[in-house]
A protein has these predicted regions:
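Cysteine endopeptidase catalytic domains of the caspase/legumain-like
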Residues: 1-286
């Protein structure tokens, strides 16, 4: 009896040993997505980059409600007309009206982020502007400007506007309907300020490659606010922006020709800068 138990226990031990160490067939798992593949092709990120790289973005500012000089009646209408046209043409538009100096600084800082990586970054400004010693300034509605030395504290230099567009990939454009007669000049004279270097209109500018600045009137001359609800310059801009298939260089020529005709050759818009060697359209041909 003891022998039977012993041999039974012996064979059971051998069986357990064989089962424990017999080679097992490896388990198969369903194929998993490659982590490297997922990281190299993030669908949402690619979409975002493509969308940003082809975007056309614009900041539109109309300053008319000046607090220390007579108000301008047309900049609000001009800004709304241009913003509307750009929106219809597919631009992502930010429209601002009657900004003080801090508000203008903030609007430009915010737009710098928005313009980053955009194919076409554009700023349109309607309102007062002036030139001092060859440097151009845009005038916020809360500016007093009793002395020429007030400009750095109370106005926005045009080169700062261009700096805020530096993230645009292909074309960076500033359109200025700001060459109006300077009412601040008389205030400076009355206060005995040295005004020899402060003039009406804007000075010539030399943007870098890929930057274009379009003045409502050429350097040293002034632009009309216009007898209607919009300035002659804004009227021409909107008309020719929405013409299909007008390449950018031709657009500038058509706007200039229309303003000259409307003002009986008293106002000549002017373009400064170098357009990249590529065709640009506000409304591309079909």
């Amino acid at each position: 009896m003891l022998e039977f138990v012993f041999f039974g226990f012996f064979f059971l031990s051998i069986l357990i040993f064989i089962m424990a160490y017999w080679p097992k067939k490896p388990m198969t798992r369903a194929p998993q997505p490659s982590a490297v593949s997922d990281l190299s092709r993030p669908r949402n990120a690619v979409r975002a980059v493509q969308g940003n790289s082809t975007a056309r973005r614009a900041l539109v500012i109309g300053n008319g409600a000046y607090t220390s000089v007579e108000r301008l009646k047309n900049p609000a209408n001009d800004a709304s007309a241009v913003a509307g046209a750009l929106t219809r043409l597919g631009f992502d538009v930010v429209e601002k009206h009657d900004l003080g100096v801090l508000q203008m600084q903030r609007a430009l800082r915010d737009f710098e982020d928005k313009a980053e990586g955009a194919e076409w970054a554009l700023v349109y400004y309607a309102g007062h502007g002036l030139e001092q010693n060859g440097r151009n300034w845009l005038i916020p509605v809360d500016a007093a400007l009793t002395r020429a030395t007030d400009l750095p504290d109370e106005a926005i230099p045009v080169e700062r506007v261009l700096d805020r567009l530096s993230g645009g990939r292909k074309l960076r454009m500033v359109i200025l309907d700001a060459c109006r007669t300077n009412p601040f000049l008389a205030r400076m004279v009355m206060n005995g300020a040295a005004t020899r270097a402060v003039t009406h209109g804007l000075a010539a500018i030399d943007p870098t490659h890929g930057e274009v600045v379009f003045y409502a009137a050429r350097d040293g001359s002034v632009a009309a606010d216009g007898p209607g609800s919009n300035s002659p310059f804004a009227t021409a801009l909107v008309k020719h922006m929405e013409e299909e298939g007008v390449e950018l260089g031709r657009f500038f020529r058509k706007v200039t020709s229309r303003v000259l005709k409307t003002t009986k050759n008293k106002q000549e818009p002017f373009v400064y800068g170098r357009i990249p060697d590529e065709d640009f359209y506000f409304k591309p041909p079909k």
